[in-house]
């Protein structure tokens, strides 16, 4: 029983540490951006993000910070992480 508890504690510690690692950022432009998006969004399909889901609130502060920018602004003009790319899937 103590061994199982020790293993569970060790696994949870490893998982917590892995989530604390900073994500690597890169710039993605042109074909490289298109291919990366195709690879990341393969199962979901690549759909353009829409602000329609936020339109009913009517308050600008409820919209996400990046709502007015596109993927090129976020990932070509500046480096971005895979999490940012995935938010566009």
Curated annotation (Swiss-Prot):
Bridged cysteine pairs (disulfide): 29-76, 41-89, 75-80
Coiled coil regions, renumbered to chain: none
Presence of the UniProt keyword Membrane in the record: no
Pfam families attached to this UniProt entry: Insulin (PF00049)
InterPro entries, per database record: Bombyxin, Bombyxin_A, Insulin-like, Insulin-like_sf, Insulin_CS, Insulin_family
Positions of post-translational Pyrrolidone carboxylic acid modification: 20
Subcellular location: Secreted
GO cellular component: extracellular space
Signal peptide: 1-19
Keywords from the UniProt entry: Cleavage on pair of basic residues, Disulfide bond, Hormone, Pyrrolidone carboxylic acid, Secreted, Signal
Family to which this protein belongs: Belongs to the insulin family.
Note: Silk worm has two kinds of PTTH: 4K-PTTH and 22K-PTTH; there are many forms of 4K-PTTH.
Xref: PANTHER family: INSULIN-LIKE PEPTIDE 1-RELATED, INSULIN-LIKE PEPTIDE 2-RELATED
UniProt subunit comment: Heterodimer of a B chain and an A chain linked by two disulfide bonds.
Protein name in UniProt: Bombyxin A-2
